[in-house]
């Protein structure tokens, strides 16, 4: 995903 690790989990 975009923005960082927390957003990457949500994809």
From Swiss-Prot:
Cellular compartments per GO CC: extracellular region
Modified sites of kind Leucine amide: 11
UniProt keyword terms in alphabetical order: Amidation, Neuropeptide, Secreted
Subcellular location: Secreted
GO biological process: neuropeptide signaling pathway
Functional note: FMRFamides and FMRFamide-like peptides are neuropeptides.
Membership in a protein family: Belongs to the FARP (FMRF amide related peptide) family.
Protein name: Extended FMRFamide-9
Naturally occurring in which organism (per UniProt): Praedatophasma maraisi
């Amino acid at each position: 995903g975009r923005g960082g690790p927390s957003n990457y989990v949500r994809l």
